[in-house]
Amino acid sequence: MSAPLSLFVTGTDTEIGKTFVSAALLHGFARAGLRAAAMKPVAAGAYERDGAWRNEDADQLDAAANVALPAAIRTPFLLKAPAAPHIVAAREGVALDIGTIVDAHRRACEMADVIVVEGVGGVRVPLADTRDTADLAVALGLPVVLVVGVRLGCISHALLTAEAIAARGLPLAGWVANRIDPAMPFADDNIDTLRAWLEREHRAPLLGALAHMSPPSPDAASHALDVNLLLNALRAAAPR
């Protein structure tokens, strides 16, 4: 039996479709015959239902995965307020310990063939005074998939994020263009520019360009993603 694969999903900003793309990837992996699970290790913004605290992003990931992880493994740190996690954690008296997340990820790898780990916010979102989301990806040792919210300014945001990923020694396995502004002029030209720059500077392929969907459908979006290309990149990046 081959070792499980895993990837870390980050984005150019918050609210640009990381959960949507992560869910679409889960559908694609399941269609490829893989047992696919998801982690949202740090989630900020919770609601109470049936006496338990839940998070909408984590719920969406659970709905897309064909392997359900225990909540304590899927989301080791569930914060109540929807704000910057290090600020909320300090106010709620929670220490966002990266080691705890690494242990949870190790356990998740025992339950599935592929694990999608969705980060919180962008790649440099602080988790503590001196640790950020990129440090988490480094500790997990995972290749990164970058979700680019296609809107005005996305070229600079994407290239800066890719530089931050490379600066930590993390492989950029690929990127996804997610059209969050349906009225954006020259969207295709922006995507073409990013395709050329990210391929040239980081050898990061475009995994798919997702049309704006209302309402969003991760299952439908999964058909626009090149899951086999991503799987090959993950296998190439896996420890020998």
Swiss-Prot record:
GO molecular function, a single term: ATP binding
Enzyme class, UniProt record, top EC level: ligase
Predominant cellular place of this UniProt entry's protein: cytoplasm
Subcellular location: Cytoplasm
InterPro entries: DTB_synth_BioD (IPR004472), P-loop_NTPase (IPR027417)
Cofactor(s) needed: Mg(2+)
GO biological process, alphabetically ordered: biotin biosynthetic process
Annotated positions binding ATP: 15-20, 57, 118-121, 178-179
Annotated catalytic residues: 40
Annotated positions binding Mg(2+): 19, 57, 118
E.C. number: 6.3.3.3
Catalytic activity: (7R,8S)-7,8-diammoniononanoate + CO2 + ATP = (4R,5S)-dethiobiotin + ADP + phosphate + 3 H(+)
One GO term describing the cellular component: cytosol
Keywords: ATP-binding, Biotin biosynthesis, Cytoplasm, Ligase, Magnesium, Metal-binding, Nucleotide-binding
The protein's annotated pathway: Cofactor biosynthesis; biotin biosynthesis; biotin from 7,8-diaminononanoate: step 1/2
Pfam families: AAA_26
Family: Belongs to the dethiobiotin synthetase family.
Role, per record: Catalyzes a mechanistically unusual reaction, the ATP-dependent insertion of CO2 between the N7 and N8 nitrogen atoms of 7,8-diaminopelargonic acid (DAPA, also called 7,8-diammoniononanoate) to form a ureido ring.
Subunit (UniProt): Homodimer.
NCBIfam families in UniProt: bioD
UniProt name for this protein: ATP-dependent dethiobiotin synthetase BioD
